[in-house]
């Protein structure tokens, strides 16, 4: 009986005798690059960041409007009832009513050009440019982080898919063993104890498969949420080794130089500084050039006629026309301490931005170091996991041979088979963890999108090359 079971066992698990490796799929496949590009095009998080950046660009235009003159036109027509000293005087002298009712008409146009406002316009433009640049780099940072999320989901799905394959093959081998043992037991040639043992192991194999299928289902949902498509025909990606840092020091230097989150935080500091400079403009006078013209009729109860019948001419018309060109200076001498308070507020905002930048710096150093350490330790771990797989294969094969000779029990063979399954699963998990660690390192240094050769949308470059922004 043991000889037959051992022979069946060797046949049933022959497909599992190879070491677990990452095997790319064939045919039409959805690459990691395609998945990331799709996510960047459709994910709401990126759309939020993009629209925030575009809104900041409009703030630049609002600030730049301070360099240009304002032109206003006004017109009006309506009935006016007037009782004034002049109407009462006419009433007393000539016996007319004290109230005058006329149709009043007004037309006017005015132009104002700010000549000097304490450099407020210049500083506001600078502030808005730095804020737009900060939002632009925040957009790129969001894209980097989303690319890492998609990469992780992509690899997690592939890993879950391959673990399901392992679990299915493990169940298949246990099912064959169970069928052989049950057949022998039913014919009276086998032991009920052997049947109980293999039944328990078969149940665990079923449980392992269900757990693997559950993990695969979860991985599919995570992927669909990020990419908005169903994962199909995926292939194992290969990180760009040339872009990976060769040391932790190099990785940290790359992160400090290239990470978009740090660049965004630096621009926030510059924007806060420009805001403080803009508040100082309140200490200076404002000089404007005003040009205006007005054409009015029947103002203030005066229609150009006289109540004195002896005046000549009796009607000179009620129109009043005026053209004015004047340079004005306005200097606020006291504002209740508001100007000083605004300056202090801006100073605190600078300190806040610096603290945010320092926090971002620490986070990036932490993330880079963790990614580097994960890669280093996984490289060390994998050689032992590989040895574990190889040793488990040898042990399983030896136990099968010994089982046929009656030197090993069925439980020994089942234990060796289960250990091989666990060893392969651990090695497979470590291989994918190593891949994820490499992509984490590319993300931590701000190089992930570039390493994936993702084409950045043209609109992300902005309408101009702003101070501190992404230069196109």
Question: For the regions a protein language model found, what residue spans apply to each?
Answer:
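Periplasmic alpha-helical coiled-coil/stalk elements that build and connect Gram-negative outer-membrane
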Residues: 2-7, 145-258, 374, 378, ...
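Bacterial N-terminal signal peptides
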Residues: 14-24
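Bacterial Sec-pathway N-terminal export signals of envelope proteins
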Residues: 27-76, 82, 114-115, 231-270, ...
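A glycine-/polar-enriched beta->alpha junction
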Residues: 37-47, 54-70, 101, 109-126, ...
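Small/polar, glycine/serine/threonine/aspartate-rich low-complexity segments that form flexible
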Residues: 74-113, 237-244, 277, 290-331, ...
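Short, charged, amphipathic alpha-helical segments
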Residues: 126-129, 192-203, 344, 410-418
């Amino acid at each position: 009986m043991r000889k037959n079971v051992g022979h069946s066992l060797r046949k049933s698990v022959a497909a599992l005798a190879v070491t677990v490796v990452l095997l790319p799929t064939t045919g039409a496949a959805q690459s990691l690059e395609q998945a990331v590009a799709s996510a960047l095009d459709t994910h709401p998080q990126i759309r939020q960041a993009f629209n925030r950046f575009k809104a900041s660009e409009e703030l630049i235009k609002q600030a730049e409007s301070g360099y240009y003159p304002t032109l206003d036109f006004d017109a009006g027509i309506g009935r006016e009832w007037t009782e004034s000293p002049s109407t009462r005087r006419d009433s007393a002298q000539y016996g007319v009513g004290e109230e005058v009712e006329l149709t009043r008409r007004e037309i006017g146009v005015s132009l104002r050009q700010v000549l000097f406002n304490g450099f407020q316009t210049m500083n506001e433009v600078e502030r808005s440019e730095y804020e737009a640049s900060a939002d632009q780099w925040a957009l790129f940072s969001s894209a980097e982080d989303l690319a890492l999320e998609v990469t992780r989901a992509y690899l997690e799905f592939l890993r879950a898919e391959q673990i399901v394959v392992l679990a299915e093959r493990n169940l298949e081998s246990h099912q064959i063993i169970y069928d052989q043992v049950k057949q022998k037991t039913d014919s009276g040639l086998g032991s009920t104890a052997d049947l109980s043992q293999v039944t328990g192991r078969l149940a665990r194999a079923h449980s392992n498969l269900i757990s693997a299928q559950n993990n695969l289902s979860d991985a599919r949902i995570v992927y669909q949420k990020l990419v908005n498509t169903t994962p199909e025909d995926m292939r194992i990606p290969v990180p760009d080794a040339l872009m990976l840092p060769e040391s932790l020091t190099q990785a940290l230097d790359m992160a400090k130089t290239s990470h978009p989150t740090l660049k965004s935080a630096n621009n926030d500091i510059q924007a806060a500084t420009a805001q403080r400079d803009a508040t100082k403009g309140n200490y200076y006078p404002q000089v404007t050039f005003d040009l205006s013209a007005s054409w009015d009729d029947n103002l203030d109860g005066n229609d150009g006629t006289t109540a004195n019948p002896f005046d000549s001419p009796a009607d000179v018309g009620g129109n009043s026309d005026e053209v004015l060109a004047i340079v004005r200076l306005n200097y606020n001498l006291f504002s209740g301490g508001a100007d000083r308070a605004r300056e202090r507020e801006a100073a605190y905002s600078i300190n806040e931005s610096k603290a945010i930048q320092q926090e971002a710096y620490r986070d990036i150093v932490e993330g880079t170091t963790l990614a580097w350490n994960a890669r280093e330790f996984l490289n060390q771990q994998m050689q032992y996991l590989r040895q574990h797989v190889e040793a488990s294969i040898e042990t399983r094969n030896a136990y099968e041979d010994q089982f046929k000779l009656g030197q090993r029990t069925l439980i020994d063979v089942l234990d060796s088979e289960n250990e091989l399954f666990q060893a392969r699963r651990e090695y497979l998990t470590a291989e994918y963890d190593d891949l994820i660690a490499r992509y984490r390192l590319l993300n931590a240094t701000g190089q992930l999108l570039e390493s994936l050769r993702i084409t950045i949308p043209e609109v992300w470059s902005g309408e101009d090359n702003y101070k501190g922004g992404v230069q196109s």
